[in-house]
UniProtKB/Swiss-Prot annotation:
It comes from Pseudomonas putida (strain W619). This is one of the proteins that bind and probably mediate the attachment of the 5S RNA into the large ribosomal subunit, where it forms part of the central protuberance. In the 70S ribosome it contacts protein S13 of the 30S subunit (bridge B1b), connecting the 2 subunits; this bridge is implicated in subunit movement. Contacts the P site tRNA; the 5S rRNA and some of its associated proteins might help stabilize positioning of ribosome-bound tRNAs. Pfam families: Ribosomal_L5, Ribosomal_L5_C. GO terms for biological process: translation. InterPro entries: Ribosomal_uL5, Ribosomal_uL5_bac-type, Ribosomal_uL5_C, Ribosomal_uL5_CS, Ribosomal_uL5_dom_sf, Ribosomal_uL5_N. This is Large ribosomal subunit protein uL5. PROSITE patterns: RIBOSOMAL_L5 (PS00358). Keywords: Ribonucleoprotein, Ribosomal protein, RNA-binding, rRNA-binding, tRNA-binding.
């Protein structure tokens, strides 16, 4: 079992149940999935960009990403319907907890000028989104082998009913919020 999953079951869930005054263990908020998305506008001019992004996300997550395509043409962005414009991965269960553990323990401390995560990046329903400016903060990515620095979006979907519940859950996981 993943280290963070065990910590959640044995320490975080009972503490949150008491803190949020919940009557049932199933009411305790938990992380259901983590979605990583890489929007690649530069893929319009160069098709190799998609291959490099797929390889990077696969190294980071240990799971093969899905290529996303434009739903409709937008002349202003020089995009045609059906063109590949990004890659995404959805992590659940064990892989999700393993990734979360690596993100908190290894990757976030490697961010340059890191002052903590914004505690206001919740969506109103307890889900948290954050952006990473460069993929080299992950130890799986070899700096010498990358073609360009690319950012990615990380979204944590939780069963929390409000932002306060979601914030309490992520604080229990020791998320480094700055405010």
């Amino acid at each position: 079992m993943a280290r963070l999953k065990e910590i959640y079951r044995n320490e975080i869930a009972p503490k949150l149940k008491e803190e949020l005054k919940l009557s049932n263990v199933m009411e305790v908020p938990r992380v259901t999935k983590i979605t990583l998305n890489m929007g690649l506008g530069e893929a319009i001019g160069d098709k190799k960009v998609i291959e490099h992004a797929v390889a990077d996300l696969e190294k980071i997550t240990g799971q093969k990403p899905v290529v996303t395509f434009a739903r409709k043409s937008i002349a202003g962005f020089k995009v045609r319907e059906g063109w590949p414009i990004g890659v995404k991965v959805t992590l659940r269960r064990e892989k999700m907890y393993e990734f979360l553990d690596r993100l908190l323990a290894i990757s976030l401390p490697r961010v340059r000028d890191f002052r903590g995560l914004n505690a206001k990046s919740f969506d109103g329903r307890g889900n948290y989104s954050m952006g990473v400016k460069e993929q080299i903060i992950f130890p799986e990515i070899d700096y010498d082998k990358i073609d360009a620095l690319r950012g990615l979006d990380i979204t944590l979907t939780t069963t929390a009913r409000s932002d306060d519940e979601g914030r309490a859950l992520l604080r229990a996981f020791k998320f480094p919020f700055r405010n």
